Amino acid sequence: MASLKIPANIPLPEEDSEQLHKAFKGWGTNEGMIISILAHRNATQRSFIRAVYAANYNKDLLKELDGELSGDFERVVMLWTLDPTERDAYLANESTKLFTKNIWVLVEIACTRPSLEFFKTKQAYHVRYKTSLEEDVAYHTSGNIRKLLVPLVSTFRYDGNADEVNVKLARSEAKTLHKKITEKAYTDEDLIRILTTRSKAQINATLNHFKDKFGSSINKFLKEDSNDDYVQLLKTAIKCLTYPEKYFEKVLRRAINRMGTDEWALTRVVTTRAEVDLERIKEEYLRRNSVPLDRAIANDTSGDYKDMLLALLGHDHA
């Protein structure tokens, strides 16, 4: 469930564009106006605002925001204003760069987005960067990491649903996974094939059979080798495919509780999940930490950056 709060009576894109244009004029930028508009519009509405702004003022709204804002506030507003597939393309490209290398983000995008949305992200990536995501991932990774990541970003995974699950296949592949993991054959082709090609519904059925038959979840079996980067990547993919809200809760917990806030992780999760399932993530965060997420963020951030995050969380005032 989305956390985004949209007012009952939405102004026309022309009105929103005019107010944003006014927010950029004068001696200082009206950050509050920017938050009050953009943080309360969905992706379609933000896209209309960008189009109307360009038509009326012959300027790119994103470039205007880039010129007027700075720091973490600029990043959260810019990421939020992008179309979701544009945003994911940008984050995926950023995650392959040597100076910001974060391959976990690639797994996150590949495994938590619906298949059609991820396909459109790859199209947006090609348009923006004149190369394919698959090519960039292959170029910027090596060894076992590449062996897992390239299939993850290459496959068009059928989303599937519970009534389409092949129970016999789930039982068989649960045994295959158990055999490979107990043998520590983590890079085995069958293991990678199962995790990168099966529908999410089929994988969930397989992993449920795994737990029922062998007494623990697959990630518990992988825990003893969790210091290995490849195994961590494997665990991340499994968590993203099966319990995305638990995965994102952990990212947020680490971003907030570490020595010094990880603003990039915090910004990424809030902007990418506010229109998807941030309410469920908030519930999981409260269950896990006994503190509401909005309060934790309010205590760990400040200024316009804090206000924008809280607005996207559905709590303009914490």
Swiss-Prot record:
Induction: Up-regulated by heat shock, dehydration and salt stresses.
Tissue expression remark: Expressed in flowers.
InterPro entries membership: Annexin, Annexin_repeat, Annexin_repeat_CS, Annexin_sf, AnnexinD_plant
Gene Ontology MF annotations: calcium ion binding; calcium-dependent phospholipid binding
Sequence positions that bind Ca(2+) 2: 256, 258, 260, 300
Family to which this protein belongs: Belongs to the annexin (TC 1.A.31.1) family.
Protein name: Annexin D6
Gene (name only): ANN6
